[in-house]
Structures are given as C-alpha cells and as structure tokens.
Design a protein with these regions (language model features):
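Cytosolic-side transmembrane helix boundary signature
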Residues: 42-81
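Membrane-interfacial loop-to-transmembrane-helix junctions in polytopic alpha-helical membrane proteins
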Residues: 5, 9, 34, 66-76, ...
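Juxtamembrane transmembrane-helix termini
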Residues: 30, 59-65, 94-97
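Membrane-embedded alpha-helical segments of integral membrane proteins
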Residues: 5-57
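Non-catalytic, solvent-exposed segments at the cell envelope interface
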Residues: 106, 110-113, 118-121, 127-128, ...
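Hydrophobic alpha-helical membrane segments
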Residues: 88, 130-133
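Transmembrane alpha-helices and immediately adjacent membrane-cytoplasm interface residues
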Residues: 77-104
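Short, Lys/Arg-rich, polar N-terminal cytosolic tail immediately upstream
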Residues: 1-3
Length: 498
C-alpha cells in the first residue's frame, strides 16, 4: 500500500522522467551522430518537457484549509509524464541497438570458409554415416589446406577413401558418373560445377559441413571522411549464411566520394571481367576473386584499374531485401517491361516503379531479359544502389533507423570505422548537402576462351575490358578525388552511363 502511494506521488513520477531524459540524452550523445546544434535542441526540449510536467503534475496549494484540491490536472500530468518516460526509454534502447549494430558491421575480424560434403540426391546418401567405407573426391588444386583439415575432422566420424582430382570439371563428372560417392569442397566453389551441370544445386545435397574461421587484418585508414576524398569497394556476395562466409563477389562497385565538393561516382565492374587474381598465379573472372577473400578482391581491382581503394564493404544479397523494405521501398526506372527470370511472380513495367525488397533484388540480378546481359544487370544494380542511397541520405530516414539497423546486422560488413560512419551521418544531418551522383560502367566485349585459373581446360565466356574504358574510368575516379566535377556522358533515365 505504501509502495503504491509512493509511486503515485508526483515527485516519484517526475524523478522517473528525469532519469529517462538523462539516459536518452546520454545515449544520443554517445552515438556521436547528432550535430551539436541538434544536441542542444534535444537538451532544451527534454528540460522544457520536464518543467511542463512539473507544472501539470504538482498539485496547487489550497488557499483555505477546507478547500478541495483539483485532482484531474495533476493526474493527467502524471499520466503524461509516465508516457513520456516510456517513450524516452524506448528511444534510448533504439539508440543502444543502433550503436551495437554499427559496432558489429565495423568489426571485421575474420572470414569463414565452409567445407561441404556433397552427394547426389535420391541415392540414399543423406548422412555422413551413409558414406562410411566409400570413396570421396576432392580437388587438390584449390584451397587444399582447408579441405585437408576438413578431411581430418570427417575421418574422426567415419572411414572413407580419398580420390584426388585436379579441376572442378573432372570432380563433378566423377560424382555424376558414380566414380565417387561424395565430394568434399569449399562451399563457395560449388558454382564451378554449373558450367557443365546446370542443375547441380537441385540435383545435389549437403550432408555435412565444417566451418573454419580465419583471422583477417585490416589496416586502419587515417582518412577524415568528412574532409578528404575516398573510394569504397562494395562487394555483393552470394553467401547462403553469414556475410563473413567466403563467397563469389557477384557485384563489384567502386563508390568514390568527395565530401568537400559533394560529388559521388559509382563505377560498376562486370563480374566476369578477365583479370589477374591477386595472390595467385593466374587470371580468371573478377567474381572468383571473392573466393580468396575481400582483401583479394580489393587488391585485384587496385592492380587492374591502377587506383587506390580506401575501404571495403561486403553486402549479402538478402540484406538488399531487408534494407529496401526498411526504407519503405525505393523508386527505380526500368527501360522495359519484363517478368523476372528467377521469380515469375515478379513483374516489372516500363517507367519509374516503386519496388519493395524482393522486387529490388530481382531487378538488380536480372540479365536474361536484356540482349546485353550482364552489362544491363550492372546498370540495374547501380540504379538500385542509387535509389537506396537517395533514401538513406534523406533526414526523414531517422523514423526508420531501427529497422534499417536490423536489416544490415549480420548481412553487412565494412572496414569503415564506427567513427567514420557517425561522422558521415553527422555531416549529412548538419548541412544536408545536395550530392552530384554520377554512374559509369566498365565497357568491353564477351569472349569464349580457355585458360581461366579455376577451370583451365574448359572454354567459358569472359568479359574482356576495353583498355580505353579502363583509362576513362580511372580518370573519372581520380578527377572526383582531385575535387573536379565529373559528368558521365550517355546516361539513361537512372543517370547511368551506357
């Protein structure tokens, strides 16, 4: 009874509001994203709210001893104060959640390699024990040390024989021809089999996996991202699990930003571009550089384009769905009407279309609807990225900030530091500058040839970049960094260079 009376006192209610106010201000300040003027405004608002609730909640003194006190106003004031306290605590938790999400995406400390034991479906080989005393095939030419580690772990569970192959084509044929009962591979390489076995994903199953975490070292950049130009590599990976899992880089986009001139350039590199892969003695598709880690992709592009990349970001494809939905959709222009090849339930109209997450991902991955295939897909990817950035840079996104943090958590990693992200957000909120965003795509031709590092004896299509286009795109990037304004010619309705 005494506790209830204590809780009903206006002093108690206002004390709760004071504590909630201090907590909210502390969390907002700790985030280091609000410009000073907004912190001052927040502080003034919190003080005014407390004073108003004091005025409403505190009972008036009686002029006469037998005069009745009015209870309606103090009761309403206490009720309103409680609601404000709850709202402030909720907002404080949201800010803490945001800090946690940013800390998670900027803490890139390891990459994960997943080794998978794969069998054909409907063969009665559904568990590791079913492969006991049978033959397992491996590829000894790629990632041999990690596969050997997985072989050792698997041998603790079952007995088996190993048959070695020197390329993925022969390894896949051995599985389909029943020369081996299963194959043990780095999961990120399973797309190698699609060149000869298009339905590999549907015809096989993974019956055992072994994960190996490898520490990665990232040299911290001393760039002040609010004053100095920088280039960030955005690598879209097709990993099925956590974004830390090594996977092909299906999307490779360079975003060059000059915070002083407010110029931004997006440069898209076709995933099949034939390049020398950093760290190995061979050339292959740029997408396959991702199999050796994000650092390999960064170094490969730096050497290929003769440019400097300051930061990297890995984005899981599933995060596109979550991010776009958290932004309440994006508006993107489509130059033709078509039905998604991957999902026949998704249809696109010609013109500007408001897309949800599923539609945006399907649009970004579509190539079958276009005569230029991957090149047009690169244009779509840039269009989606531009639309996302346009939404993210709008101050109104603060209303959806918690949902956005949920979307990127676990599906996004970057070598940008938490302080860098905070500084960029603070800069945008403080001055809300209008950005000049330009887009360009590396030009070239598709040719069928042998000699790729992964499948040297198999003739497949590679994208051979034009030297003139490499030079032009390098100049675009350097011009942005030098403070010049770049205008990319021959752009479509999304502003993308053809």
């Amino acid at each position: 009874m005494k506790l209830i009376k204590w809780l009903k006192r206006y002093q108690t209610v206002l004390t709760f509001q004071f504590i909630a106010s201090v907590l909210l201000f502390y969390r907002a300040h700790k985030m280091n994203m609000l410009p000073f003027k907004y912190e001052v405004i927040l502080g003034v608002i919190l003080i005014l709210l407390w004073l108003i609730m004091l005025k409403l909640s505190k009972p008036k003194k009686r002029k006469y001893r037998h005069e009745k006190r009015k209870k309606a106003r103090p009761a309403f004031g206490k009720f309103l104060s409680i609601l404000l306290s709850i709202a402030m605590i909720f907002a404080s938790n949201m800010l803490a959640k945001t800090n946690g999400a940013i800390a998670k995406i900027t803490n890139v400390s390891y990459e994960t390699t997943v080794i998978s034991l794969i069998t054909l479906k409907d063969k009665g080989l559904d568990h590791p024990k079913d492969v006991n005393n049978k033959t397992i095939g491996i590829n000894t030419e790629v990632n041999n040390s990690k596969v050997s580690e997985a072989v050792s772990k698997l041998s603790d569970k079952i007995d088996f024989k190993i048959k070695k192959y020197n390329d993925f084509a022969n390894l896949a044929d051995a599985l389909y021809d029943h020369k081996v009962s299963a194959i043990l591979i780095d999961q990120s390489y399973d797309t190698m089999f699609l060149e000869k076995h298009l339905n590999f994903a549907n015809e096989t199953q993974t019956i055992w996996t072994y994960k190996i975490k490898v520490p990665v070292s990232n040299t911290r950049s001393n760039i002040d991202v609010t004053k100095e130009p920088f280039t960030i590599l955005i690598s879209g990976v097709d990993s099925r699990g956590d974004v830390s899992e090594k996977s092909r880089s299906d999307v490779d986009m360079l975003v060059t930003i000059n915070p002083k001139t407010h110029n931004m350039l997006m440069t898209s590199l076709p995933r099949d571009t034939f390049v020398k892969i950093s760290g190995i003695n061979g050339r292959d598709k740029l997408t396959h550089a991702g199999l050796f880690g994000t650092k390999a992709v960064k170094n490969t592009i730096e050497n290929f384009m003769n440019i400097k990349i300051d930061f990297t970001a890995r984005v899981g494809f599933q995060s596109v769905i979550k991010i776009v939905d958290a932004l309440d959709g994006i508006d993107v222009y489509s130059d033709k009407a078509f039905t998604s090849y991957a999902d026949s339930t998704i249809h696109f109209v010609k013109g500007t279309m408001h897309m949800d997450g599923r539609q945006a991902l399907a649009f970004a991955r579509e190539r079958h609807a276009y005569t230029t295939g991957d090149l047009h897909r690169n244009q779509n990817q840039i269009a989606v990225m531009h639309a996302i950035l346009k939404k993210v840079m709008d101050p109104s996104i603060l209303a959806n900030y918690s949902d956005l943090m949920d979307a990127i958590s676990g599906t996004f990693q970057t070598t940008l530091q938490a302080g860098d992200i905070s500084a960029l957000i603070k800069m945008q909120l403080n001055s809300n500058p209008k950005w000049n965003v330009q887009h360009s795509i590396l030009a070239g031709t598709s040719r069928k040839r042998k000699g790729g590092y992964m499948m040297p004896k198999t003739a497949i299509y590679y994208f051979i970049a034009d030297e003139s286009s490499i030079k032009q795109n390098r100049e675009y990037i350097n011009d942005i960094r030098d403070g010049k304004t770049v205008t990319v010619a021959n752009s479509d309705a999304n502003g993308i260079s053809q």
